[in-house]
A protein has these predicted regions:
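Cytoplasmic membrane-interface "Motif A"-like loop-to-helix N-cap segments
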Residues: 76-90, 171-177, 282-302
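Juxtamembrane intracellular "pre-TM" segments in multi-pass secondary transporters
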Residues: 1-14, 203-229
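C-terminal transmembrane helical hairpin of 12-TM major facilitator-type secondary transporters
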Residues: 295-335
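Symmetry-related core transmembrane helices of the 12-TM Major Facilitator Superfamily/SLC fold
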Residues: 86-95, 175-194, 298-300, 319, ...
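Substrate-agnostic recognition of the 12-TM MFS/MFS-like secondary transporter fold
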Residues: 18-71, 111-169, 209-218, 232-284, ...
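C-terminal ends and interior cores of transmembrane alpha-helices
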Residues: 89-108, 284, 300-316
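Helix-loop junctions at membrane interfaces in 12-TM secondary transporters
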Residues: 100-116, 195-199, 310-325
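Membrane-helix interface/capping residues of multi-pass secondary transporters
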Residues: 50, 80-81, 140, 173-175, ...
Length: 401
């Protein structure tokens, strides 16, 4: 056992798998999710009016309902690696096609909405596949040691990609940065090729593909799923409100300056990533091992509540509006996701992937769409501080659960 493995308290055989999954996490979260969301947001907000903002919350969940329903069926029949390869190839083709279209018409509402929807769907599938694949690689006992470690890729990606995007924002067209997503998808496929033979369920793939897909009754009656679903839905509502608050503040501050907006968002990701690094490497692992999943899930609502109070006290200053979203960045892809996915481990492997697809693709999108309709109804004239009040109420409900 190497010094690094002893320092990280990894058992023999865990180090190689954990290292490859850190790379997978870096590519998925940094190269696909962060790059896609920042570039898509800058293109959207700098080219379209404030009245269009609610559509970037309304359209993605509606499309995700259809995509997730299809994915849930395929997940019960095809192996996880095969699904990862298909998603990577189709996503890369779509991104390259969209980049060409942006060179023709960069202010099209249809194209920019389509791009945002496409990026959102890709991001949802990529992170879903990351965690289900990680669940196939590690037992429940191994996961308690390894899951906080493999999320280090998510933490580092905020630093690396946030700083990188901020540095090049003033000299590179935002649309060209979409090519980073293509390269990251290639990395994801490569890591999957390397680790596919080591999955715990590799020997039972043929049986799982031929077995009956879990029914809705199976999904609804498992004792853990209602609690997990409730947490996911609350996180969705609060995160989307925080994101909408930031959209309103960004557009009022930067207007049509897409490069300035991207530079700010890159810096925002960098500083959030710095906080996430401190949490990930100094706190997360020991917190989960000593106090368990409950403590890990409690940090995010407390941080968002503090950010909402800052919005109210400062009258909606840009830095204050960034705090709830920053809390989401610091905690969601680190200790919160690790804690939430530990809750999935007692669920049988035959049910786990379909359960995640059911929660993320069937339950969550209608809730997000309903919230977007509320954004449309209220209108962009509503200030970020007005939205801070319902966030505080929802956080109290979250902590009660």
């Amino acid at each position: 056992m190497t010094f690094l493995s002893r320092w990280l308290r990894l058992q023999p055989g865990e180090g190689s798998r954990a290292g490859w999954m850190v790379l997978y996490s870096l590519a998925a979260v940094g190269g696909v999710i962060i790059t896609g969301s920042l570039v898509g947001r800058a293109l959207f907000l700098s080219a379209l009016p404030a009245e269009a903002i609610p559509y970037k919350y309304l359209l993605p969940p509606l499309v995700l309902i259809v995509v997730s329903a299809l994915y849930a069926r395929l997940a019960a029949r095809w192996s996880r690696p095969r699904l990862i390869y298909i998603v990577c190839v189709l996503s890369a083709v779509g991104i390259l096609s969209t980049r060409w279209l942006l060179s023709v018409e960069s202010h099209s509402f249809t194209l920019l909405c389509g791009l945002y929807v496409f990026i959102d769907v890709i991001s949802a599938l990529v992170i879903l596949q990351f965690w289900t694949f990680a669940g196939d690689l590690f037992t429940a006992r191994e996961a308690r040691r390894v899951f906080p470690l493999i999320t280090a890729g998510s933490t580092l990606s905020n630093l690396v990609f946030g700083l990188g995007l901020s540095a090049v924002a003033s000299s590179v067209d935002p649309g060209d940065l979409l090519l980073i997503m293509v390269g990251s998808l290639v990395v994801i496929a490569g890591v999957t090729v390397r680790l596919a033979p080591e999955t715990i369920s590799a020997s039972t793939d043929n049986e799982s593909r031929q077995s009956r897909p879990p029914s809705r009754i199976d999904l609804r009656t498992h004792p853990l799923l209602p609690t997990i679903a409730g947490l996911v839905l609350l996180v969705t509502i609060i995160s989307n409100i925080a994101d909408y608050q930031l959209d309103l503040a960004l557009q009022r501050h930067y207007g049509d300056d897409g490069r300035g907006m991207l530079a700010f968002l890159g810096s925002f990701r960098f500083w959030s990533g710095l906080g996430a690094c401190a949490l990930q490497f100094l706190v997360a692992r020991r917190l989960l091992e000593r106090f368990g999943v409950g403590a890990g899930l409690l940090l995010l609502p407390v941080a968002i509540a503090g950010g909402s109070m800052a919005i109210l006290l400062t009258g909606g200053a840009l830095w204050a509006v960034s705090v709830p979203r920053g809390s989401d960045v610091v905690l969601k892809y680190t200790i919160h996701d690790a804690s939430l996915n530990l809750l999935f481990l007692p669920i049988p492997d035959s049910l786990r992937a379909s359960a995640k697809a059911w929660i993320d693709g069937i339950l969550r999108p209608p809730v997000a769409a309903a919230l977007a309709l509320m954004f449309l109804w209220v209108g962009p004239e509503t200030t970020p501080q007005a939205w801070a009040i319902p966030v505080l109420v929802l956080v109290m409900v979250w902590m009660w659960l």
